Amino acid sequence: MKHCLLVAGFLAFSTLTSFAQRNPEDKAGWKLGSQSYSFRLFTFAEAIRKIDSCGLKYVEAFPGQTIGGGIEGKMDYKMDAATRQAVKKLVADKGLTLVAFGVVNAPNEADWKALFEFAKDMGIKNINTEPKVEQMPYIGRLADEYKINVALHNHPKPSHYWHPDSVLAVIGTSKYVGSCADIGHWVRSGLDPVDCLKKLQGHILGMHFKDVKKDTPDGKYHDVIWGTGDCKVDAVIAELKRQKFKGPISVEYEYHWENNGPEIAESVKYFRSAYSKSK
């Protein structure tokens, strides 16, 4: 009888483990999800429904998005406890996990502490931000205190953190301070995304993942289905594997805003295929 119970327990555990790691990237500790900004024309409630329909289970929220779903207000680190609880239930009821918040900045140390308290309460592991350089000492101390990652995001130049060197110059010694690597913005800045990842090795805490191409009359880059642009998606995946990266990877698709879900779903499919083929 005892033997049967042990076998049954093992099978149940194996089934649960298999279910939890049903996508190929799960075993590497990659939390492939979406920035809700990809669905900025919709409420947060609608965004998480769309994220779920794309085959994703992780969410990065952005400040200022109307919550919806019968909940008043906007996504914000200053929202009250009742609103936070309602948002957590909204996400959990969809079977999703909130892993990151950003890109968000705070004006002073007191507000940064409030931002960390918000992240702690919401179960958020990564705060994606582009703070002033002079704020970094107290941000680093708070990151150590709360054990929550502060990931410096790179918008294209002339933003301060457009180049990996500017990130490395300010992160200090805290293991909780590093990079939110946006590979599309590196390409927009004329940088090679694989070279940038190599330069930041050991300091990459999360990703904004996209593929971009410059094929419109105005000569500006725009998002395309992954694997069809200039972001070297396959090589980026291989490099992240080589570095043994672990953390959130947020789809950020800033094109065809009204109906980009099918393109995101196709990109996710490509990503998982490329991951499986990569050594």
What are these regions (language model features)?
Residues 26, 84-85, 90-178, 187-190, ...:
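Active-site acidic/histidine proton-transfer and metal-coordination neighborhood
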Residues 20-36, 40-58, 121, 165-168, ...:
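Histidine-acidic metal/acid-base catalytic patches
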Residues 38, 63-65, 104-107, 133-135, ...:
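Active-site-proximal loop/turn and secondary-structure-junction residues that shape catalytic pockets
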Residues 1-24:
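Bacterial Sec-dependent N-terminal signal peptides
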Residues 74, 124, 257:
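Second-shell loop/turn segments in exported
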Residues 39, 78-79, 107, 131, ...:
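Residues that cap or flank secondary-structure elements
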Residues 61-86:
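Glycine-rich, proline-tolerant flexible connector loops at the mouths of alpha/beta enzymes
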Residues 60-61, 100, 128-129, 152, ...:
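Hydrophobic residues in well-ordered beta-strands that form the structural core
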